[in-house]
């Protein structure tokens, strides 16, 4: 089963930058999107063979997630946990016979870490949610998780130590998640690979210089790790400040 995850940084804009051509090229069973920044009625496009599930933020033009799937899920749910987590369209869960798929756009901690306290609460709550699902069947957790976990996952770790996405607090939450029975699929296959990033600032020619961050993930339950055929980062795909990440799973 081939799964793709991509923060498109506004799907309407991405549609004008070859999104449908990308979908044809990817030939994925499931495409998970983050930061769609739209409601489904705001754009019409033809994507034959895929069912579409959307979770839009209350605030127009902000956040949002979507799952496009060739395989009909057993069930689809939106958001999780407390009311505070339910207004920004950040999570969709699709249940398949073999696993739960959780598409997530993790809240950014913002400039001056203005939202770090909320982010910490989110991380604890999403981990609890994933563990609850994992008690029923394996989990595939994907999306823009807004953290570069280790120094190898960011081009310039030193200057970014207190920047959103690379604080000790955020990185420790990822460590805690992985320690609770989950596997970072890319690092499982490529533990020492450098220069592998999924997001680049639009400033300073960051993408041209590959001054990036790996903040987009496929994370799976420990018991799925032997089913990982491949995990990849398609850094050559343009259309957003992020690139797609891909998981091939033998299920």
Task: Report each predicted region and the residues it spans.
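Structured beta-strand-rich core segments of catalytic domains in phosphoester-bond hydrolases
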Residues: 37, 42-109
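Conserved beta strand-loop-helix elements of the APE1-like EEP
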Residues: 60-75, 204-226
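N-terminal, active-site-proximal structural segment of metallo-dependent hydrolase catalytic domains
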Residues: 1-47, 51, 57-63, 78
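Active-site beta-strand termini and strand-to-loop segments that position acidic
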Residues: 70, 94-97, 221-222, 247-251
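Active-site beta-strand/loop signature of hydrolases that rely on acidic residues for catalysis
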Residues: 7, 23-41, 101, 130-151, ...
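Metal-dependent phosphoesterases centered on the DNase I-like endonuclease/exonuclease/phosphatase
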Residues: 30, 51, 122-211, 215
């Amino acid at each position: 089963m081939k799964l793709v995850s991509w923060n498109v940084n506004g799907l309407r804009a991405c549609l004008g930058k070859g999104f449908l051509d990308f979908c044809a090229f990817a030939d994925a069973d499931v495409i998970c999107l983050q930061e769609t920044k739209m409601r489904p009625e705001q754009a019409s496009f033809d994507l034959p063979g895929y069912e579409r599930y959307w979770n839009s933020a209350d605030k127009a033009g902000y956040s949002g997630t979507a799952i496009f799937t060739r395989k009909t899920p057993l069930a689809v749910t939106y958001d999780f946990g407390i009311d505070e987590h339910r207004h920004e369209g950040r999570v969709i869960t699709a249940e398949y016979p073999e696993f739960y798929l959780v598409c997530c756009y993790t809240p950014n901690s913002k400039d001056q870490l203005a939202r770090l306290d909320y982010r910490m609460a989110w991380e604890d709550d999403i981990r609890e949610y994933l563990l609850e699902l994992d008690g029923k069947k394996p989990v595939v957790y994907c999306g823009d998780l807004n953290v570069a976990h280790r120094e190898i996952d960011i081009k310039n770790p030193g200057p970014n130590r207190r920047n959103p996405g690379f604080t000790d607090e955020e990185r420790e939450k990822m460590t805690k998640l992985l320690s609770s029975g989950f596997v970072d699929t890319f690092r499982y296959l490529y533990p020492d690979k450098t220069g592998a990033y999924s997001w680049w600032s639009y400033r300073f020619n960051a993408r041209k210089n590959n001054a990036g961050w790996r903040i987009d993930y496929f994370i799976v339950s420990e018991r799925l790790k032997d089913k990982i055929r491949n995990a990849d980062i398609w850094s050559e795909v343009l259309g957003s400040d992020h690139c797609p990440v891909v998981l091939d799973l033998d299920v």
